[in-house]
Structures are given as C-alpha cells and as structure tokens.
Curated annotation (Swiss-Prot):
SMART domains: AAA
Pfam family, one: ATP-synt_VA_C
Molecular function (Gene Ontology), one example: ATP binding
Lineage: Eukaryota, Viridiplantae, Streptophyta, Embryophyta, Tracheophyta
Assembly with partners or alone: F-type ATPases have 2 components, CF(1) - the catalytic core - and CF(0) - the membrane proton channel. CF(1) has five subunits: alpha(3), beta(3), gamma(1), delta(1), epsilon(1). CF(0) has four main subunits: a(1), b(1), b'(1) and c(9-12).
Family, similarity comment: Belongs to the ATPase alpha/beta chains family.
Biological process, per Gene Ontology: proton motive force-driven mitochondrial ATP synthesis
Keyword Cytoplasm (UniProt): no
Listed name of the protein: ATP synthase subunit beta, chloroplastic
NCBIfam families according to UniProt: atpD
GO cellular component, one term: chloroplast thylakoid membrane
Residues that coordinate or bind ATP: G172, G173, A174, G175, V176, G177, K178, T179
E.C. code: 7.1.2.2
Length: 498
C-alpha cells in the first residue's frame, strides 16, 4: 500500500507527526481503536499498525475503518492476519483510503489487496496511485450508446454478444475451459481493441491463481522477456486471506482498470473470479461488525455493496470497462440472495457445458443456455438477429430429436428432419474455433473471426449451400472459407487413399 500524505494548506503532515491511536480490542480480523479527541479518522481511511510482537518480529498490518463507535473509538477490518497484535499497540491514521499503484507499470505483475507486488520481481516502477474507494461516474460522463463488444469468438458474437461496457456472468464447472476462454478474451482484446485486461482473483484457490499465471506466461499473455509488453495485470486475494482482503481485492482490481479507462482512454476487460466470494467475504465482515444478518444469513447491506462495485464498471465517453464475472451458485439455487443480486446487474450470460466439452467442441459455450440483452434487431440489426434465431431454432430442434435418434436411429426421421439434423451437426462443429492461447496444446493456429464473417458463414450453412460438405470440415476452423478449403483437402486425401 502506498501511503499518501494528506495536505492541509501548505503544510504536509506525515505519518510520524500524527497523533497515534491505540488498539483497545481485537476480535479476529476486526480491531477497535481509540484515538485522541479531535483526531478521529474518516470511514474507509487506511490505518497502519506498526510495532513488534512478543518475540520481537516486526508487525505491519493495514486496516480499513468501517464504523465509528462513539467515545473517540473506531472499528476497523484488517487486510492481513492479526497474529501477534496486542492491546495497546500504536495505530496510525494515514488520512486517506487504501491507495494502489495504477498505469502501465502494473501490467504483467501480481498484486495483493494493498497493491503490493507479490511476484518477487521487485518494486512497481510507478509513482501514480489511486484510492480504491471512488464514486461511480456521473450520469453526464456515461456513454449511453448500445454497441457490441466484438470478441472474435464466433459462438459469443453470434448468439450471446457482449455489450461494450457491459457485465457478463460466466457459469462453468471445473475443467470445461473457463480459464482458456478467459485467456483468449484477454489476448483478443489486446489485439483487436488495443486494450488491456485486469484479473481480480477474489477468494480463489491459490493453486488456480498460480496455474493461471503459469498458463498466461506460456501463452504469451504475460511476456517474461519484456514485462511491459504484457496485456494483463493480476490482483489476488486468495481463500486463505482474511475476509477484509477478500472483500476489497475486487475494488483494487477495479481501480487499476478505471485508470486505463479514464486516463489512458482504453477499452478494458475486467475479470472477477469469483463474484460470489466478494459477497461471502462481506457477509463474514458484517457479522464481525455486529450487524444484524438479513435473508439466508447474508449482510443487510448486500445490494448496496454489490451496487457500489458494479456501478463503477461502465462505459464513459473516454473508454469502457467490460466485466466478465465468474458466478458460483450455492447448491445450484439461483434464488439464493448472492447470485440473485448479481443477476440484476448482468447484461449477458455465457454458460459452459460439460456435454459439449466431452464432445471435444471448444469453446464449450452452450448456444441455447447462454443469453444476452444485446440480441435485439434494433441493436444488432435484422440480419444478425434472424441468423442467430435460425441457428438457435435448428439446434433446439436437433436437441428435441436426439431421443428419437438414440432409440430408432436417423433412418426413422423424415427427409426434412434428417436435413435439419445434418445442418445442426455442421453448426455445432462450426461453433468450435481454434484459440490463439491454445496453439501450444493443439498445434493449430488461432483464429479471430469478425462478426460479418461469422454471420456469413452461418447463413451459408442454413441456406443449404454447404449441405454436400462433410461435417468434420467445419470442426475447429475460423471462417467458412477455411471450412470449404478443409473439405477439399479431406476429399483429396480420401481420393489418394483409394
């Protein structure tokens, strides 16, 4: 955490000159601190406990003021473990909220909630910092145009398009390609939009965070040789951190993203994995602060806390923050207050299907379960809307016929249904796509497919012009021209074998 000295007139008051407070009570990660009269800190101010424990080891714990208790006492939540703290220790008010480094120097680095690098690559080469608590952009600053955020991924752009500056919920279990999809989006936004990404690991498993970092280095999203060429900044608050850190790490990531949007005027992609853990941490802190629990034991301030985070994720006239949030649904209950509050903010949902992953169709995005508020004729245009609806109808009919096919076989279907099934299978395979970040695993070069090319390809399949091509020609290709070229190659190979 960078300490920002507070300025009063021409005098700068440093930490050493401030009147310190004293710890008077410790309840797990929550501290009560007494300050001299007239020296009370503001809500959200950062406090620092700098002392030595009983065996002489230095202690440096940052806290955030959450409540004013009266009688010159405040209640604060610690951002790191409170082991070794005792009553009577000195507490210094920094006079400002937690501030974290921002700007290009953060790319390719891993930070904790306080903005301290944790990747053993030395200090961050920037003096620019920003407080993690800021108000959402004013109405007058917002960009109200509804525009599609093109990802270059066919299934997303056609069937559940993302809104520029929108919020997307990513639903997927373990091993269905969520990490690879996240990395491809980070790669594509850098190439197609000249943008950058910020990844906020909120209450993640440490192993998963480490795996993501290693995979990003392997795929070139993080450039080890020239760290400044990296396309992403990582902010982690893992499962083993105190609830204060898990509750605020999302804001740290968002603050870094806001700088790229407002100052660098870039399109930014913000990943939050997992938004449920943000709510969970808030619930733990709420109980420790003595607030009365609300529905299902969640904090009474659930909607406000979620709103204060989500309202900052938006498009302004300078740039945009498009957010992709992994959503854990407790006990698969969509009416649980945590996911239900999240759904109210989402513009699109991308659902990953284990069934498609088992078939080898990647990205394993479920074309029928994924939704988007952007898929309307007045926003995407009649041609896009009609093509998307016909693709969905074809796939839905294929899904309905699958039981009949399994029991009686394809031969029992009508001629019309057999043709529809053949086209649906081509569509299903054409929704797959080779990824840039998966080149090291698959050996096939990645493809970025523009929206116009995507629509043209699916129109050709639906029109029946490509009925004569084998379905394997559509598997893991970019645009439709590659599929026809692949079909010719397959035909030549089969002729040679004869």
């Amino acid at each position: 955490m960078r300490i920002n000295p507070t300025t009063s007139g021409s005098e700068v008051s440093t930490l050493e000159k401030k009147k310190p407070g004293r710890v008077i009570q410790i309840i797990g990660p929550v501290l009560d601190v007494a300050f001299p009269p007239g020296k009370m800190p503001n809500i959200y101010n950062a406090l620092v406990v700098q002392d030595r424990d009983s065996v002489g080891q230095p202690i440096n714990v940052a806290c955030e003021v959450q409540q004013l208790l009266g009688n010159n006492r405040v209640r604060a939540v610690a951002m790191s473990a409170t082991d070794g703290l005792t009553r009577g220790m000195e507490v210094i008010d920094t006079g400002a909220p937690i501030s974290v480094p921002v700007g290009g120097a953060t790319l390719g680095r891993i930070f904790n909630v306080l903005g301290e690098p944790v990747d053993n690559l030395g200090p961050v080469d920037t003096n620019t910092t920003s407080p993690i608590h800021r108000s959402a952009p004013a109405f007058i600053q917002l960009d109200t145009k509804l525009s599609i955020f093109e990802t270059g991924i066919k299934v997303v752009d056609l069937l559940a398009p993302y809104r520029r500056g929108g919020k997307i919920g990513l639903f997927g279990g373990a091993g269905v390609g969520k990490t690879v999809l996240i990395m491809e989006l980070i790669n594509n936004i850098a190439k197609a939009h000249g943008g950058v990404s910020v990844f906020g690991g909120v209450g993640e498993r440490t192993r998963e965070g480490n795996d993501l970092y290693m995979e990003m280095k392997e795929s070139g999203v993080i450039n080890e040789e020239n760290i400044a060429e990296s396309k992403v900044a990582l902010v982690y608050g893992q499962m083993n951190e105190p609830p204060g850190a898990r509750m605020r790490v999302g804001l740290t990531a968002l603050t870094m993203a806001e700088y790229f949007r407002d100052v660098n005027e870039q399109d930014v992609l913000l990943f939050i994995d997992n938004i449920f853990r943000f709510v969970q941490a808030g619930s733990e802190v709420s109980a420790l602060l003595g607030r009365m629990p609300s529905a299902v034991g969640y904090q009474p301030t659930l909607s406000t806390e979620m709103g204060s985070l989500q309202e900052r994720i938006t498009s302004t006239k300078e740039g945009s923050i498009t957010s992709i949030q992994a959503v854990y649904v407790p006990a698969d209950d969509l009416t649980d207050p945590a996911p239900a509050t999240t759904f109210a903010h989402l513009d699109a949902t991308t659902v990953l299907s284990r069934g498609l992953a088992a078939k080898g169709i990647y990205p394993a995005v479920d074309p029928l379960d994924s939704t988007s508020t952007m898929l309307q004729p007045r926003i995407v245009g009649e041609e896009h809307y009609e093509t998307a609806q016909r693709v969905k109808q074809t796939l839905q009919r294929y899904k309905e016929l699958q039981d009949i096919i399994a029991i009686l076989g394809l031969d029992e279907l009508s001629e019309e249904d057999r043709l529809l099934v053949a086209r649906a299978r081509k569509i299903e395979r054409f929704l797959s796509q080779p990824f840039f970040v998966a080149e090291v695993f698959t050996g096939s070069p990645g493809k970025y497919v523009g929206l116009a090319e995507t629509i043209r390809g699916f129109q050709l399949i639906l029109s029946g012009e490509l009925d004569g091509l084998p379905e394997q020609a559509f598997y893991l290709v970019g645009n439709i021209d590659e599929a026809t070229a692949k079909a010719m190659n397959l035909e030549m190979e089969s002729n040679l074998k004869k």
